[in-house]
Curated annotation (Swiss-Prot):
HAMAP family: MurB. The active site is at 173, 223 (proton donor), 293. Its cofactor is FAD. Pathway: Cell wall biogenesis; peptidoglycan biosynthesis. InterPro entries: FAD-bd_PCMH, FAD-bd_PCMH-like_sf, FAD-bd_PCMH_sub1, FAD-bd_PCMH_sub2, MurB, MurB_C, MurB_C_sf, Oxid_FAD_bind_N. It comes from Streptococcus pneumoniae (strain JJA). Its EC number is 1.3.1.98. This is UDP-N-acetylenolpyruvoylglucosamine reductase. Pfam families: FAD_binding_4 (PF01565), MurB_C (PF02873). GO terms for molecular function: FAD binding; UDP-N-acetylmuramate dehydrogenase activity. Keywords: Cell cycle, Cell division, Cell shape, Cell wall biogenesis/degradation, Cytoplasm, FAD, Flavoprotein, NADP, Oxidoreductase, Peptidoglycan synthesis. Belongs to the MurB family.
Length: 301
């Protein structure tokens, strides 16, 4: 029995797509094919999938919402798992529990509907709840570490564990999940009671700021670089005269130099080449070495 036949038999009922182009699922609109793109409907299907992959020595990874990711043009080998069907969100008192595939922005709106404060900072951050925990996403002085109560994960060995914020060892755009290989299943956020109108005003203010400053009208991978201590990446790039600097179909945004936008059918290679060139030119200009925030995955073509 071939691996494909075994896969279809053992993983019967799970949505598996073979040789699926990933550019359709990426915010950058670039990326080659996944060998197997999988859409589990619940944690049990996810556990079955991970168990099968481990038994058959097939590599696997969770892509999240692909909002702060560049998938290389050669694609990704093995299983690529999209958890957007694991998207239930519930409210219990001042606590919100969200599955990993829940949309982060929509989760902040649920907090608003229940007059819960603490989540406003994330009201414009694209991506999934699981990806936000993985990266310790943050903006405007807030971050996931400030509100996370606990997190349920599937370990790389297929076991389910509950982790505290301390266990996750949060840092700037970092969590312990990045090293552990675990998959976020669900998250509990501890919020506080607030006033609906006040929360809405703050979310509207932050949304307006984001729309004003960020090139949301183009495909992009969000913030490309981490914030250097004592500086802003976008400012350093701008001071190096790189606004509008372009390689292939990808350019440094004129609106916000911390963003690289896909303006003309750019490729992942265009993104990588532009990122490397910007790092070198900023280093020459200011002596500061920028560090990537965006993750680059897969194989070159």
């Amino acid at each position: 029995m071939s691996v494909r036949e075994k896969m279809l038999e053992i993983l019967e009922g799970i949505d598996i797509r073979f040789k699926e182009p990933l550019h359709s699922y990426s915010y950058t609109k670039v990326g080659g094919e996944a060998d197997y793109l999988v859409f589990p409907r619940n944690r049990f299907e996810l556990a079955r999938l991970v168990k099968f992959a481990n038994q058959e020595n097939i590599p696997w990874m969770v892509l999240g919402n692909a909002s702060n990711i560049i998938v290389r043009d050669g694609g990704i080998r093995g299983f690529v798992i999209l958890c957007d069907k694991l998207n239930n969100v519930s409210v219990d008192g001042y606590t919100i529990e969200a599955e990993a595939g829940a949309n982060l922005i929509e989760t902040t709106r649920i907090a608003l509907r229940h007059s819960l404060t603490g989540f406003e900072f994330a009201c414009g951050i694209p991506g999934s709840v699981g990806g936000a925990v993985f990266m310790n996403a943050g903006a405007y002085g807030g971050e996931i570490a400030h509100i996370l109560q606990s997190c349920k994960v599937l370990t790389k060995d297929g076991e389910i564990e509950t982790l505290s914020a301390k266990d996750l060892a949060f840092g700037y755009r970092h969590s312990a999940i990045q090293e552990s290989g675990a998959v976020v299943l669900s998250v509990k956020f501890a919020l506080a009671p607030g006033t609906h109108q006040v929360i809405k005003q703050e979310m509207d203010r932050l949304t307006h700021l984001r729309e004003l400053k960020q090139p949301l009208e183009y495909p992009s991978c969000g913030s490309v670089f981490k914030r250097p201590v004592g500086h802003f990446a976008g400012q350093l790039i701008s001071e190096a005269g790189l606004k509008g600097y372009r390689i292939g179909g990808v350019e440094v945004s004129e609106k916000h130099a911390g963003f690289m936008i896909n303006v003309a059918d750019g490729t992942a290679k265009d993104y990588e080449d532009l990122i490397q060139s910007v790092i070198e030119k900023v280093k020459e200009h200011s002596g500061i070495t920028l560090e990537r925030e965006v993750r680059i995955l897969g194989e070159s073509k």
